[in-house]
């Protein structure tokens, strides 16, 4: 379809569980993208993990042909986006390829913080946003109230919002009509030199690198010689097509269209996300503004349980990085765990997902150390360094000032749960910045230390608000704070992988809690195991795992007491010798226990 006026590129913005993937299923069914036999629930959530957790992680794309009421056939290019706060970078990437977005809001639950944040991103990128009220089949749906909320919180006129139910299929055609009429057609010159944006790339074992692209001008055909601007190496295009959602080879993509391209690129970094593709003979075409690089917020060490897996672990990470541009990694070695990688993630969910994908898709056994955020440290000679690993922190004597990252958290919560949410934020050392009532909800914004937010704040927030509160946060600045490194010593030996950076006021409490937790998890040995928590040279907590001991006097019947004493002394000497040479194996649960210690 070469007529640009009949193309619509759009994505769907929605909070988790507001029915985005189900709505996509209905679009595919309505436009005949798959036969009824092939329809599975949540077609676009193709990763096993996505279906299991019921969330969208990776952006997907699908091209559909829709016969509109005005008799014309439109080509709809839909780019699916995730809704969870940790995957917001995927959203900004998908939006860069669209002219419009559907804002899907649950008519029973109302607006949630994440949709608000993504909606603002869309408006900033100049997209046309069309509100849709979903789940109209629910008895508790309140469309008028929710439409008013959309207007109050986001500032979009929602009086004309389309009402539908993705589950029952009610109003799906109205949504498609609103989409065709409300979202502008793409602009682009088909005869100009090729310029295409890589939205996503992934590695296929048979095809090499597959890239999802949006062509902004020109035409991309099979057998073309293309280069990506940042790398400049020429490749010949083997396959061009669209997803319907199955791979469908078309042989050509024109300006305004979204599809996939395979060019036999075998090296993993051959087609970086956000790069511009053009023909090798028009290499001077202006590069499109890519996406801002996302900075990881949480760092953790990942180590293979068996050191033989190190190479396959490195390859697995390289393949995942291609598909997930926000994952950062560098080699790291630890005394306790051997060789592994220090990885940077966008949040705790992202970290869990990556670890699960590595274990499932690449069949690896991994140990994860406690996650930390990045701290800014001013040393005594005036240089500023960034520390993302507690064991790399300089000694107390060399530190002039430590600064922790502060983020602004925007929370939307029903007014009944406001008290509990405020209590939680205060407990996490938060400073209230703003509070306003919007309908039956309250919008609160707090400045909170990032390390308090990334650990377990999201889970705690959900539990104190019975799952109704929603959260969106972004980094603001570094701020000076009284921070110290808490070391864990086992039999007077520091275990680098268990070190933590904590606030000085919480340190003794955290140290005690950590020592007690370790006592539960470290199995009893044949000798006493002393567990200590220390700040610098000062021990703030200590506990002992008592030794297992054999009853050596069992064989003595009566007789002289000196006989028993001799046997006990002999046992004592043996235990003492054992303690000097014995090593304590620390189980994987102990490394994870660091996360579970309530701050």
Curated annotation (Swiss-Prot):
UniProt KW keywords: Cell inner membrane, Cell membrane, GTP-binding, Hydrolase, Membrane, Nucleotide-binding, Protein biosynthesis
Signal peptide: none
Main location per the UniProt record: membrane
Binding-site residues, GTP: 17-22, 134-137
Domain tr-type G: 5-187
One annotated GO biological process: positive regulation of translation
Known function: Required for accurate and efficient protein synthesis under certain stress conditions. May act as a fidelity factor of the translation reaction, by catalyzing a one-codon backward translocation of tRNAs on improperly translocated ribosomes. Back-translocation proceeds from a post-translocation (POST) complex to a pre-translocation (PRE) complex, thus giving elongation factor G a second chance to translocate the tRNAs correctly. Binds to ribosomes in a GTP-dependent manner.
Enzyme superclass (EC): hydrolase
Family: Belongs to the TRAFAC class translation factor GTPase superfamily. Classic translation factor GTPase family. LepA subfamily.
Reactions accelerated catalytically: GTP + H2O = GDP + phosphate + H(+)
The keyword Membrane is assigned to this record: yes
EC number: 3.6.5.n1
Keyword Nucleus (UniProt): no
Location in or out of the cell: Cell inner membrane
GO cellular component: a single term: plasma membrane
Xref: NCBIfam families: lepA, small_GTP
SUPFAM superfamilies reported for this sequence: EF-G C-terminal domain-like, P-loop containing nucleoside triphosphate hydrolases, Translation proteins
CDD domains registered for this protein in UniProt: EF4_II (cd03699), EF4_III (cd16260), LepA (cd01890), lepA_C (cd03709)
Lineage, top ranks: Bacteria, Pseudomonadati, Pseudomonadota, Gammaproteobacteria, Cellvibrionales
Topology of the protein relative to the lipid bilayer: Peripheral membrane protein
Recorded superkingdom: Bacteria
Protein name stated in the entry: Elongation factor 4
A GO MF label: guanosine tetraphosphate binding
């Amino acid at each position: 379809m070469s007529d640009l006026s009949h193309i619509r590129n759009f994505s769907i913005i929605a909070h988790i569980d507001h029915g985005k993937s189900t709505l996509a299923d209905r679009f595919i069914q309505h436009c005949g993208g798959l036969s009824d036999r092939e329809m599975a629930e949540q077609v676009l959530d193709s990763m096993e993990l996505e279906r299991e957790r019921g969330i969208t992680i990776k952006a997907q794309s699908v091209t559909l042909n829709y016969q509109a009421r005005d008799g014309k056939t439109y080509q709809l290019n839909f780019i699916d986006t995730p809704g969870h706060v940790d995957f917001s970078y995927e959203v900004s990437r998908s939006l860069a390829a669209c002219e419009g977005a559907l804002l899907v809001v649950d008519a029973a639950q109302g607006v949630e913080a994440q949709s608000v944040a993504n909606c603002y991103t869309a408006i900033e990128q100049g997209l046309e946003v069309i509100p849709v009220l979903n789940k109209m089949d629910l008895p508790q749906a309140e469309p008028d109230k929710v439409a008013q909320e959309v207007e109050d919180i986001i500032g979009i006129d929602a009086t004309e919002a389309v009402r539908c139910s993705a589950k029952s299929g009610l109003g799906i055609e109205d949504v498609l009509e609103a989409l065709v009429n409300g979202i502008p057609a793409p602009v682009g010159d088909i005869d100009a030199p090729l310029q295409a944006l890589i939205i996503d790339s992934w590695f296929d074992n048979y095809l090499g690198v597959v890239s999802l692209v949006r062509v902004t001008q020109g035409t991309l055909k099979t057998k073309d010689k293309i280069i990506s601007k940042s790398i400049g190496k020429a490749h010949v295009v083997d396959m061009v097509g669209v997803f319907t959602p199955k791979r469908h080879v078309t042989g050509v993509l024109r300006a305004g269209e979204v599809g996939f391209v395979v060019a036999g690129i075998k090296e993993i970094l051959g087609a970086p996300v956000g790069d511009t593709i053009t023909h090798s003979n028009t290499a001077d075409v202006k590069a499109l503004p890519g996406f801002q690089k996302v900075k990881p917020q949480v760092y953790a060490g990942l180590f293979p349980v068996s050191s033989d897996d190190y190479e396959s672990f490195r390859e697995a990470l390289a393949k995942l990085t291609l598909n997930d541009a926000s994952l950062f990694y560098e080699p790291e070695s630890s005394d306790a765990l051997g060789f592994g990688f220090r990885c940077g993630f966008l949040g705790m969910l992202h970290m869990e997902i990556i670890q699960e994908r590595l274990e499932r898709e690449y069949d690896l056994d991994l140990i994860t150390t406690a996650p930390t955020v990045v701290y800014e440290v001013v040393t005594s000679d005036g240089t500023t360094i960034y520390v993302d690993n507690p064991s790399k922190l300089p000694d107390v004597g060399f530190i002039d000032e430590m600064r922790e990252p502060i983020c602004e958290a925007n929370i939307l919560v029903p007014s009944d749960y406001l008290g509990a949410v405020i209590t939680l934020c205060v407990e996490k050392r938060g400073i209230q910045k703003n509070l306003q009532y919007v309908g039956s909800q309250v919008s609160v914004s707090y400045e909170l230390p990032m390390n308090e937010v990334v650990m377990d704040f999201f889970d705690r927030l959900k539990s104190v608000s019975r799952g109704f509160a929603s959260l969106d946060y972004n980094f603001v600045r570094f701020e000076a704070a009284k921070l110290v490194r808490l070391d864990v010593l086992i039999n007077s030996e520091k275990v680098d992988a268990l070190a933590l950076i904590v606030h000085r006021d919480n340190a003794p409490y955290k140290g005690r809690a950590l020592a007690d937790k370790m006592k539960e998890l470290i199995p009893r040995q044949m000798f006493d195991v002393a567990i200590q928590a220390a700040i610098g040279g000062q021990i703030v907590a200590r506990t002992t795992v008592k030794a297992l001991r054999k009853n050596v006097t069992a064989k003595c019947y009566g007789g002289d007491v000196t006989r028993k004493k001799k046997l006990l002394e002999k046992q004592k000497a043996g235990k003492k010798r054992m303690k000097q040479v014995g090593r304590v194996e620390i189980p994987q649960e102990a490394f994870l226990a660091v996360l579970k210690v309530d701050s």
